[in-house]
């Protein structure tokens, strides 16, 4: 499989968009049931404000919030009046306005600050939008049996009630952070997550393939496999491979200055195998280099920028307080998402705890996406 350099990305994407346009103009049917891609217009972004054991995330959450409200509505869930007060103080401290007209506050009890995973999946079917609530058990108990998750399991129901949308309960344990949609016909995910026996005992890939097609309206399911070193989620797709348009996927690549650079490193092998699997499924693959490491609070980890959030006119990715690699990642994201403003927000405490910007946020598609998919900017 050829390696496509970031320098070739702009020309490649131009050709890709022309190819997509020709497919649509040729009259290819758009599925009646689908999940909009993340780059499509959004109604809002949601997050659960960190409290108690996650208070160290507050500064990065405030910075994240202050960017989002410049572009779209932000719904913030808080667990108690104390958490609300702390959240508002943090936003002020970082130069924002907690009374900004684009912020809506909701007192909804929850257990954690990872709303990507326990929050809603939005599905369009027959010209209506519904909320899917997939079962959640705190990543298969990755953080121990004493970590509660009952309240997190109810958040999707609460969101649906606020929005006045119908709710569909899915009796399969899974997280939205392990779902990548191209908005047309494909879902991409890591089998090591949904097939984890701590989540779904006895679940088979054949059954998953059938279930995913039925629940999402896709005709193609692409499974990668493997758990990167130190990944507490068991390998969520949003740290490994991301769609940037309906036919192009960016896949992490272990560079020479990364911990996983050795060819026989298990993480290196997982990323390479993912790229090969995705290319074999018919998608163009761009490799996203991991160019350095970071030592923070005794933890040494690679600077992996894959965990980005796409919003209305912007992209935010996790920053590692490493000026060289942070800036290089920003330049690459400008190529992947031309026309959008790019932000790199330091979130080291989140990363040490197991995730980044994408993991904390949950995007709500705009009602306009009911009509037809938006293929690119």
Where do the language-model regions lie?
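The feature marks the mature, well-folded catalytic cores of soluble enzymes
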Residues: 27-376
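Bacterial N-terminal signal peptides
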Residues: 10-21
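Intervening/peripheral non-core polypeptide segments
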Residues: 1, 376-377
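Signal peptide processing junction and immediate N-terminal pro/mature segment
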Residues: 22-26
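Bacterial N-terminal signal peptides that target proteins for export
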Residues: 1-11
């Amino acid at each position: 499989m050829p390696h496509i350099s970031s320098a070739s990305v702009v020309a490649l994407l131009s050709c890709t968009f022309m190819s997509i346009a020709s497919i649509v103009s040729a009259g290819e049917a758009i599925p009646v049931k689908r999940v909009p891609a993340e780059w499509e217009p959004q109604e809002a972004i949601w997050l659960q404000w960190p409290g108690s054991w996650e208070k160290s995330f507050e500064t990065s959450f405030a910075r994240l919030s202050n960017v989002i409200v410049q572009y779209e509505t932000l719904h913030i869930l808080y667990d108690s009046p104390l958490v609300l007060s702390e959240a508002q103080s943090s936003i002020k401290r970082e130069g924002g306005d907690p009374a900004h007209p684009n912020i809506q506050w909701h007192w909804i009890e929850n257990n954690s600050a990872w709303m990507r995973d326990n929050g809603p999946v939005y599905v369009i079917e027959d010209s209506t939008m519904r909320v899917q609530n997939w079962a959640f058990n705190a990543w298969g108990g990755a953080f121990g049996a004493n970590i509660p998750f009952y309240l997190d399991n109810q958040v999707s129901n609460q969101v649906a009630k606020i929005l006045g949308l119908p709710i569909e309960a899915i009796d399969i344990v899974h997280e939205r952070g392990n779902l990548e949609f191209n908005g047309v016909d494909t879902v991409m995910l890591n089998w090591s997550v949904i097939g984890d026996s701590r989540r779904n005992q006895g679940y088979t890939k054949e059954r998953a393939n059938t279930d995913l097609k039925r629940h999402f309206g896709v005709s193609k399911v692409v499974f990668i496999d493997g758990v990167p070193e130190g990944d507490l989620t068991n390998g969520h797709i949003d740290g490994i491979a991301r769609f940037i348009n309906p036919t192009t996927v960016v896949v992490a690549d272990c560079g020479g200055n990364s911990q996983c650079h050795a060819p026989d490193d298990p993480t290196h092998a997982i990323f390479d195998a993912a790229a090969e699997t995705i290319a074999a499924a018919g998608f163009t693959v761009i490799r996203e280099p991991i160019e350095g490491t970071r030592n923070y609070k005794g933890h040494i980890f690679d600077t992996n920028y894959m965990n980005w959030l796409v919003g209305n006119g912007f992209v935010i990715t996790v920053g590692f307080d490493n000026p060289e690699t942070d800036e290089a990642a920003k330049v690459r994201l400008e190529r992947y998402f031309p026309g959008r403003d790019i932000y790199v927000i330091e979130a080291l405490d989140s990363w040490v705890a197991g995730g980044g910007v994408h993991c904390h946020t949950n995007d709500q598609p705009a009602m306009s996406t009911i009509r037809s998919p938006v293929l690119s900017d």
